[in-house]
Regions:
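Multi-pass alpha-helical membrane architecture of UbiA-family
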Residues: 1-292
Length: 292
C-alpha cells in the first residue's frame, strides 16, 4: 500500500508540475491579448443583453483565454528552443522549453479544441478561427516561419485580433466593418513589433532577422508609432471617440523614445495598458447595448 501511495503521489506531483509549466508557457500576463478582443467583439456585435452571454461567446472566451495561448506560445517555444537559451527574458518571467514530450501533445490538443465548439458558431466566424490557427502555426513553425521575415513577422501578428473578429461574426452572423478590422490589425502589428524590441540583441546574436532587428530600436519606435497612428485613424473614421482612445499608443511610444525609458521596463507596462484600453472599449460597447 505504501508503494502504491508513493507512486500515486509522485504521479500527481509530476502532473502538477506539467500543468504548472504549461500555464507558465501560456504567458498568463498576456492571456487577455487573445481573450480581450473576444469581449470587445461581443460587446459591439450584440443587439441585446441576451446576446452577450451565450454558449458560443462563453466557448470563444474560454478557448482564447488559456488553450489558445498554450497553442500559440507552445509552438513558439518549441521552435525557438535554441534561441531562447540565450534570451535573458526567458530566465525571468517566462519559461524555457527543454524538450518535454508532453508540450507538443498539449499544443496539438489545443489546436484541435475549436472542432468541439465550432458547431455553436455562425459559419461567418469559422474563417477567423482557421486564420488564427494557420497564422499562429506559420509564425513560428517551418517552412514558413514568418517571425524570421521582416515586415511579414509584423503583418502576420494581426492574428491577435482574429479572436475579436470571430466573436463579432459569431454574434452578429456578419463580418465587422472593414475599418474595424484594419484598425485592429494595425494595432496588433505595432504591438508585436514593439514587443520585439527587447529581443533585438538576442535575435541578432542568433542570426534572426525581424522587423525590429533590421530597423533598430529607434526606427522600430517610429514604425510602431506609424502603425498606431494609422490604427487610430481607422477607428476614428468609425467613431471619433474610438480614434481618440487609440491615440494613447502613439503617445506612449513617443514618450518612451523621448524619455529614453528602458524598453525592458516599458515592455511589461503594456499588458496593464492594453487591459485598461480594452476595458474602456468593452464598456463603450456595453453602453451601446444597454442604452441604444
Amino acid at each position: 500500500m505504501t508503494g502504491r501511495s508513493s507512486s500515486a503521489t509522485e504521479a500527481e506531483s509530476a502532473l502538477g508540475e506539467e500543468l504548472s509549466y504549461l500555464l507558465t508557457l501560456s504567458r498568463p500576463r498576456f492571456w487577455l491579448y487573445l481573450a480581450g478582443p473576444v469581449l470587445v467583439g461581443v460587446a459591439y456585435a450584440a443587439a441585446s443583453v441576451g446576446e452577450l452571454v451565450t454558449p458560443a461567446t462563453v466557448a470563444l472566451f474560454a478557448y482564447f483565454l488559456v488553450p489558445a495561448n498554450v497553442f500559440l506560445y507552445g509552438i513558439n517555444d518549441i521552435y525557438d528552443r535554441e534561441i531562447d537559451a540565450e534570451n535573458p527574458k526567458k530566465a525571468d518571467r517566462e519559461a524555457r522549453y527543454r524538450g518535454q514530450r508532453y508540450v507538443p501533445a498539449a499544443v496539438g490538443l489545443c489546436a484541435a479544441l475549436p472542432l468541439l465548439f465550432a458547431p455553436l458558431l455562425s459559419t461567418a466566424a469559422w474563417p477567423w478561427l482557421v486564420a488564427f490557427l494557420i497564422l499562429g502555426a506559420a509564425y513560428s513553425a517551418p517552412p514558413v516561419r514568418f517571425k524570421t521575415t521582416p515586415i511579414l513577422d509584423s503583418v502576420s501578428n494581426g492574428l491577435y485580433v482574429t479572436p475579436g473578429i470571430a466573436a463579432y461574426a459569431a454574434v452578429a452572423a456578419i463580418q465587422p466593418p472593414l475599418l474595424a478590422i484594419a484598425g485592429g490589425w494595425l494595432w496588433a502589428m505595432g504591438m508585436h513589433t514593439f514587443s520585439a524590441v527587447p529581443d533585438i540583441e538576442p535575435d541578432r546574436e542568433a542570426g534572426i532577422r525581424t522587423t525590429a532587428t533590421v530597423l533598430g530600436e529607434g526606427r522600430t519606435y517610429a514604425y510602431c508609432g506609424a502603425c498606431w497612428l494609422a490604427s487610430a485613424a481607422a477607428f476614428g473614421a468609425l467613431d471619433y471617440r474610438l480614434g481618440a482612445l487609440m491615440l494613447v499608443y502613439p503617445a506612449l511610444v513617443a514618450a518612451i523614445a523621448v524619455a529614453n525609458v528602458a524598453v525592458d521596463r516599458a515592455y511589461w507596462w503594456f499588458p496593464a495598458i492594453n487591459t485598461v484600453v480594452g476595458a474602456l472599449l468593452t464598456m463603450g460597447g456595453l453602453w451601446r447595448v444597454a442604452h441604444g
